[in-house]
Protein backbone atom coordinates (compact mmCIF):
# COMPACT_ATOMS: atom_id res chain seq x y z
CA UNK A 1 0.00 0.00 0.00
CA UNK A 2 1.33 3.44 -0.93
CA UNK A 3 1.07 6.16 1.68
CA UNK A 4 1.65 9.88 1.54
CA UNK A 5 4.47 10.90 3.89
CA UNK A 6 3.35 12.43 7.20
CA UNK A 7 5.80 15.27 6.71
CA UNK A 8 7.70 15.95 3.57
CA UNK A 9 11.10 14.29 3.63
CA UNK A 10 12.02 15.75 0.27
CA UNK A 11 10.17 18.75 -1.06
CA UNK A 12 9.17 18.13 -4.65
CA UNK A 13 8.78 14.37 -4.25
CA UNK A 14 5.71 13.13 -6.14
CA UNK A 15 3.94 9.84 -5.47
CA UNK A 16 1.30 8.27 -7.71
CA UNK A 17 -1.12 6.72 -5.23
CA UNK A 18 -3.56 5.60 -7.95
CA UNK A 19 -3.70 6.34 -11.70
CA UNK A 20 -5.93 9.35 -10.94
CA UNK A 21 -4.43 10.43 -7.59
CA UNK A 22 -0.97 11.96 -7.39
CA UNK A 23 0.48 13.68 -4.33
CA UNK A 24 3.35 16.13 -4.28
CA UNK A 25 5.27 17.11 -1.16
CA UNK A 26 5.77 20.84 -0.85
CA UNK A 27 8.09 21.44 2.12
CA UNK A 28 5.97 20.52 5.19
CA UNK A 29 2.71 19.98 3.30
CA UNK A 30 1.27 17.94 0.45
CA UNK A 31 -0.91 18.87 -2.49
CA UNK A 32 -2.89 16.29 -4.43
CA UNK A 33 -3.74 16.21 -8.13
CA UNK A 34 -6.93 14.32 -9.01
CA UNK A 35 -7.24 13.32 -12.65
CA UNK A 36 -5.89 10.54 -14.84
CA UNK A 37 -3.30 11.96 -17.27
CA UNK A 38 -3.75 8.89 -19.51
CA UNK A 39 -7.31 10.05 -20.18
CA UNK A 40 -7.31 13.86 -19.85
CA UNK A 41 -5.22 16.97 -19.39
CA UNK A 42 -7.71 18.25 -16.79
CA UNK A 43 -7.24 17.96 -13.05
CA UNK A 44 -8.50 19.11 -9.66
CA UNK A 45 -5.99 20.35 -7.08
CA UNK A 46 -6.44 19.58 -3.40
CA UNK A 47 -4.81 22.33 -1.33
CA UNK A 48 -2.35 24.91 -2.59
CA UNK A 49 0.88 24.26 -0.73
CA UNK A 50 3.35 26.54 0.97
CA UNK A 51 4.16 30.15 0.13
CA UNK A 52 6.45 30.45 -2.90
CA UNK A 53 5.57 26.95 -4.15
CA UNK A 54 3.38 27.93 -7.12
CA UNK A 55 6.21 27.35 -9.60
CA UNK A 56 6.81 23.83 -8.29
CA UNK A 57 3.09 22.99 -8.40
CA UNK A 58 2.65 24.40 -11.92
CA UNK A 59 5.72 22.56 -13.20
CA UNK A 60 4.51 19.29 -11.67
CA UNK A 61 1.08 19.79 -13.26
CA UNK A 62 2.72 20.27 -16.67
CA UNK A 63 4.94 17.22 -16.18
CA UNK A 64 1.95 15.08 -15.24
CA UNK A 65 -0.82 16.45 -17.49
CA UNK A 66 1.10 18.11 -20.33
CA UNK A 67 2.02 21.68 -21.23
CA UNK A 68 -1.63 22.40 -22.04
CA UNK A 69 -2.87 21.11 -18.67
CA UNK A 70 -6.12 22.57 -17.42
CA UNK A 71 -6.92 23.07 -13.75
CA UNK A 72 -10.68 22.73 -13.17
CA UNK A 73 -10.90 23.79 -9.51
CA UNK A 74 -9.06 23.88 -6.21
CA UNK A 75 -10.54 22.25 -3.12
CA UNK A 76 -9.10 23.33 0.22
CA UNK A 77 -9.04 21.04 3.22
CA UNK A 78 -8.62 24.23 5.29
CA UNK A 79 -7.05 27.66 5.09
CA UNK A 80 -3.82 27.39 7.08
CA UNK A 81 -0.72 28.95 5.50
CA UNK A 82 0.76 25.61 4.44
CA UNK A 83 -2.41 24.73 2.49
CA UNK A 84 -3.08 28.12 0.84
CA UNK A 85 0.45 29.49 0.47
CA UNK A 86 0.52 29.44 -3.34
CA UNK A 87 -3.22 29.91 -3.83
CA UNK A 88 -3.19 33.50 -5.06
CA UNK A 89 -0.35 32.81 -7.52
CA UNK A 90 -2.13 29.70 -8.80
CA UNK A 91 -5.29 31.75 -9.31
CA UNK A 92 -3.31 34.27 -11.36
CA UNK A 93 -2.38 31.44 -13.74
CA UNK A 94 -5.67 29.56 -13.59
CA UNK A 95 -8.72 31.63 -12.71
CA UNK A 96 -10.76 28.73 -11.29
CA UNK A 97 -13.29 28.16 -8.50
CA UNK A 98 -11.89 27.54 -5.02
CA UNK A 99 -14.07 25.34 -2.81
CA UNK A 100 -13.99 25.33 0.99
CA UNK A 101 -16.26 24.62 3.94
CA UNK A 102 -18.45 27.52 5.08
CA UNK A 103 -16.63 27.72 8.43
CA UNK A 104 -13.38 28.52 6.60
CA UNK A 105 -14.96 31.45 4.74
CA UNK A 106 -13.84 34.20 7.18
CA UNK A 107 -10.20 33.14 6.76
CA UNK A 108 -10.44 33.03 2.96
CA UNK A 109 -12.20 36.38 2.51
CA UNK A 110 -9.93 38.50 4.68
CA UNK A 111 -12.58 38.96 7.38
CA UNK A 112 -10.79 37.16 10.22
CA UNK A 113 -7.41 35.75 11.13
CA UNK A 114 -7.15 32.32 12.67
CA UNK A 115 -7.21 32.45 16.48
CA UNK A 116 -3.95 31.97 18.36
CA UNK A 117 -3.05 28.36 19.11
CA UNK A 118 -3.77 26.75 22.47
CA UNK A 119 -0.51 26.93 24.43
CA UNK A 120 -1.57 24.08 26.74
CA UNK A 121 -1.49 21.38 24.06
CA UNK A 122 1.65 19.21 24.33
CA UNK A 123 3.90 18.16 21.46
CA UNK A 124 6.57 19.88 19.39
CA UNK A 125 4.26 20.85 16.52
CA UNK A 126 1.85 22.49 18.99
CA UNK A 127 4.73 24.33 20.66
CA UNK A 128 5.98 25.59 17.30
CA UNK A 129 2.54 26.69 16.08
CA UNK A 130 2.73 30.23 17.57
CA UNK A 131 5.47 30.84 14.98
CA UNK A 132 3.18 29.89 12.07
CA UNK A 133 1.35 32.65 10.14
CA UNK A 134 -2.32 33.01 11.14
CA UNK A 135 -3.35 35.83 8.80
CA UNK A 136 -6.24 35.44 6.41
CA UNK A 137 -6.19 35.95 2.66
CA UNK A 138 -8.89 37.27 0.36
CA UNK A 139 -9.85 34.99 -2.51
CA UNK A 140 -13.53 35.93 -2.27
CA UNK A 141 -13.85 36.46 -6.03
CA UNK A 142 -13.03 32.77 -6.60
CA UNK A 143 -14.41 31.28 -3.38
CA UNK A 144 -17.37 28.91 -3.47
CA UNK A 145 -18.78 27.34 -0.34
CA UNK A 146 -19.15 23.58 -0.46
CA UNK A 147 -22.76 22.35 -0.41
CA UNK A 148 -23.97 20.88 2.90
CA UNK A 149 -24.74 17.57 1.11
CA UNK A 150 -21.09 16.50 1.26
CA UNK A 151 -20.86 16.32 -2.53
CA UNK A 152 -17.80 17.79 -4.20
CA UNK A 153 -18.42 19.89 -7.32
CA UNK A 154 -16.52 18.57 -10.36
CA UNK A 155 -15.47 15.39 -8.49
CA UNK A 156 -18.07 12.69 -9.08
CA UNK A 157 -17.71 9.73 -6.75
CA UNK A 158 -15.98 11.82 -4.09
CA UNK A 159 -17.51 13.38 -0.99
CA UNK A 160 -16.19 15.57 1.74
CA UNK A 161 -16.43 14.85 5.45
CA UNK A 162 -16.44 17.76 7.87
CA UNK A 163 -13.56 16.95 10.24
CA UNK A 164 -13.34 19.99 12.54
CA UNK A 165 -10.78 20.34 15.28
CA UNK A 166 -7.64 21.38 13.48
CA UNK A 167 -9.68 24.30 12.11
CA UNK A 168 -13.44 24.95 12.36
CA UNK A 169 -14.07 24.10 8.71
CA UNK A 170 -11.46 21.41 8.14
CA UNK A 171 -12.59 18.74 5.67
CA UNK A 172 -11.28 15.39 4.51
CA UNK A 173 -12.09 13.92 1.09
CA UNK A 174 -13.32 10.37 0.62
CA UNK A 175 -14.03 8.15 -2.38
CA UNK A 176 -16.13 5.12 -1.47
CA UNK A 177 -15.44 2.87 -4.48
CA UNK A 178 -11.75 2.41 -3.62
CA UNK A 179 -11.84 3.67 -0.01
CA UNK A 180 -9.39 6.52 -0.64
CA UNK A 181 -9.15 9.19 2.04
CA UNK A 182 -7.35 12.51 1.76
CA UNK A 183 -7.22 13.50 5.41
CA UNK A 184 -5.69 16.97 5.15
CA UNK A 185 -4.42 17.75 8.64
CA UNK A 186 -7.13 15.75 10.44
CA UNK A 187 -4.46 13.41 11.82
CA UNK A 188 -3.50 16.05 14.38
CA UNK A 189 -6.94 16.12 16.02
CA UNK A 190 -6.33 13.21 18.40
CA UNK A 191 -3.33 12.71 20.67
CA UNK A 192 -1.43 15.58 19.15
CA UNK A 193 1.21 15.12 21.84
CA UNK A 194 2.27 11.92 20.10
CA UNK A 195 3.30 14.00 17.09
CA UNK A 196 6.95 14.61 17.95
Regions found by a protein language model. Give the residues of each.
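Active-site metal-binding motif and surrounding structural segment of the metallo-beta-lactamase
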Residues: 54-100, 104
Amino acid sequence: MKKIPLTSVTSGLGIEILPDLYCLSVQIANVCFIGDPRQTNEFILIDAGMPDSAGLIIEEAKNRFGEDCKLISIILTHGHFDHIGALQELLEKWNVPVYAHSLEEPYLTGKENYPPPNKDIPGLVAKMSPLFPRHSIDVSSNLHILPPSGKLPSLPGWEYIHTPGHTPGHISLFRENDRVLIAGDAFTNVEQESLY
